[in-house]
Amino acid sequence: MAIQRYMKNVRPDAPWCPDNIEFIRRINGLDSVEDVKQIVLDASYFVFGLGDVYLGAPLATPLDPTHRLVTTKYNPARTWTAEGSVGIGGSYMCIYGMEGPGGYQFVGRTIPVWRNKGFAHLGDEPWLLRNYDQIRYVEVDAQELLLLREACSNGEYFPQVESVELD
């Protein structure tokens, strides 16, 4: 919906419209959009900052340089981005912690990273992620994502968290 709004109200001829993943594929010289998807799913993203976009939004980059996708940001920025959107801008990945403007190229959507009631399994902080965390994505269909997002918002779902050492 954000891309359609952007095309209607801001810049209908932008090179990343109507498909951000196709745009990422082209500027990274990949053979298919499946290649983009596989790189995102195979990557382990290292969180080195929070709040880049709003409310606990992680700023992260893949640990393995072969998983780094590089892309431009929207110019001008979108006036609306859905909460939980996952995007890449430059070589960084971000998850939008709230609805608002934005410019990262969309690669997906995930569970909320900000919860006013806190995440009980993480010490009741309102943000899901911390500096030095690693993020791995798992592909789910739209219906499963809706159920996971609702369960997470209600405090009934907790993402898998494990301790690992960086080498």
Where are these regions (language model features)?
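Conserved "landmark" site that anchors the functional core of diverse proteins
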Residues: 1-167
